């Protein structure tokens, strides 16, 4: 909690927790910082395209429980898409380079465990010298958007290469009739795999209703028949590949909104509420085809859902590929920050580097950047506001919040002051008195 002062006035506001894996406030802070880092320091002013890959249920559990396998599988996916872009530009891997930034999302709209990849790819390639001795800067060459046929062929290639990768790793067993994953649990006594399996399949994990489907609310009519998607989607064996969102080179505001969207926290407080009988109600971001708009949890099962969404320790959910990788020789010449492997570009000593600007981005500046709301200026008198104290004692915070809640209740319960009589009513009364006299 932060206490601020405006000249002779005072203001108290709440700030977020620190370090929670699923805390909405901490997640929002990371969302803003990540988007600012990408737009200011990493992503160049060239067209970009978002590729989204979803995997079948068994692979979602594999990626959630074995992060090292997920990292290798993500490398397979990146190489498939990068090869597609390079070949479409009619170049080779030696003469062209591309890059991407991947956000690994672990959650779905219904708070279900759904590990999938949001990849911000260069919408083209950089042409480079094949021998690596030419000092000329890389030249960007854009490629056309993928057609529905290309998306379908690409998702089939990804599915086949991931299957071969899992067979080599000894994780996928194939026979004449079917194929299945052969997984070994790192900790057989841990309840986390049980919670993850139920979360992936939309089932209740704990309590007397264990194993049943989560209770849902259908508040709108279902959609009948097939409704074609707004943009092409490739589907194959449980995989889904979408690439319909793009940004032009000069659309930096749109790019930052996309970055904030794919880096958003798992839980949205605006969609979360309690029912009259104490159950947890969560509104879906997009209604299902059958008209489902909400999911209902018992409090204990809701906690189990949150536990399943927490990643393992020291698992990086943001990955950099190609020219954006830290060890890439081209990063120093392509990224706006001009930092990377090789000789760094000299900066003016009087200028502030992007890293220093990011370190100075306080929570007030984050609010102003995202919501265009300046917490350092009073909305009533336009006077300057400064933070005079940060409070972390739970007892003091609870006492202040209780006092503020009572103050708001008293203000709402106070009898509203009577408005002045309308001018027309006064004129009518004066006219009547005039006629009588």
For every predicted segment, state its role.
Residues 1-437:
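Beta->alpha loop/short-helix hinge microenvironment recognizer with preference
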């Amino acid at each position: 909690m932060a206490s601020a002062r405006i000249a002779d006035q005072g203001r108290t506001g709440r700030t977020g927790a620190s370090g929670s894996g699923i805390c909405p406030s901490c997640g929002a802070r990371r969302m803003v910082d990540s988007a600012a880092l990408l737009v200011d320091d990493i992503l160049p002013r060239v067209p970009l395209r978002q590729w989204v890959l979803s995997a079948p249920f068994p692979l979602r559990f594999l990626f959630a429980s074995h992060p090292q396998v997920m990292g290798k599988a993500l490398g397979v996916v990146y190489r498939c898409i990068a090869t597609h872009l390079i070949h479409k530009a009619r170049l080779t891997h030696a003469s062209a380079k591309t890059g991407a930034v991947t956000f690994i999302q672990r959650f779905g709209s219904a708070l279900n465990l759904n590990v999938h990849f949001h990849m911000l790819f260069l919408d083209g390639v950089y042409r480079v010298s094949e021998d690596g001795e030419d000092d000329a800067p890389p030249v960007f060459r854009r490629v056309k958007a993928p057609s529905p046929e290309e998306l379908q062929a690409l998702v089939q290639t990804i599915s086949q290469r991931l299957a071969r990768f899992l067979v080599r790793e000894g994780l996928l067993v194939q026979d004449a009739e079917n194929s299945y994953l052969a997984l070994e649990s790192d900790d057989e006594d841990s309840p986390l795999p049980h919670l993850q399996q139920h979360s992936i399949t939309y089932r209740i994990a704990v309590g007397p209703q264990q194993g049943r489907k989560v209770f849902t609310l259908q508040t709108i009519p279902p959609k009948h028949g097939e409704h074609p998607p707004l943009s092409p989607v490739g589907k194959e064996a449980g995989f889904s590949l979408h690439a319909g969102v793009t940004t032009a080179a000069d659309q930096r505001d749109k790019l930052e909104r996309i970055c904030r969207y794919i880096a958003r926290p798992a839980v949205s407080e605006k969609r979360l509420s309690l029912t009259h009988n104490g159950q947890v109600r969560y509104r879906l971001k997009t209604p299902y085809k059958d008209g489902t708009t909400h999911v209902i949890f018992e409090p204990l099962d809701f906690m189990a859902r949150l536990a399943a969404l927490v990643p393992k320790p020291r698992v990086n959910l943001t990955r950099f590929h190609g020219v954006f990788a830290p060890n890439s020789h081209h990063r120093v010449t392509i990224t706006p920050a001009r930092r990377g492997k090789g000789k760094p570009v000299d900066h003016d000593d009087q200028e502030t580097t992007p890293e220093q600007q990011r370190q100075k981005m306080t929570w007030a500046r984050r609010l102003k950047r995202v919501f265009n709301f300046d917490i350092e200026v009073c909305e009533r008198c336009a006077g300057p506001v400064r933070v005079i104290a940060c409070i972390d004692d739970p007892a003091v915070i609870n006492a202040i919040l209780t006092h503020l809640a009572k103050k708001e209740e008293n203000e709402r319960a106070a009898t509203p002051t009577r408005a002045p009589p309308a001018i027309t009513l006064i004129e009518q009364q004066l006219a009547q008195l005039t006629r009588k006299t």
